[in-house]
């Protein structure tokens, strides 16, 4: 089961140049507090970043789970944020990246 044996966490170049630190940290917060040990997670998670009345919503869904979940945060939404973000677990090395960077990992 993925995301249960964390050794290292990082964010790709594309992520750190397109999202502020507090948004990046929110992905780890969601995984640690709401997804890990609640759902059997795959090695690749996908989130959509949505505009919810000027605030950001993280939409999580998986083709392997019958559930999708929206996480509303008070961070301001920026239309320049990437619409989709992936989080990979590669044997305990967890990385947040843009979908177009997936071939690099």
Model-derived features with residue positions:
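N-terminal "domain-start" segment
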Residues: 1-73
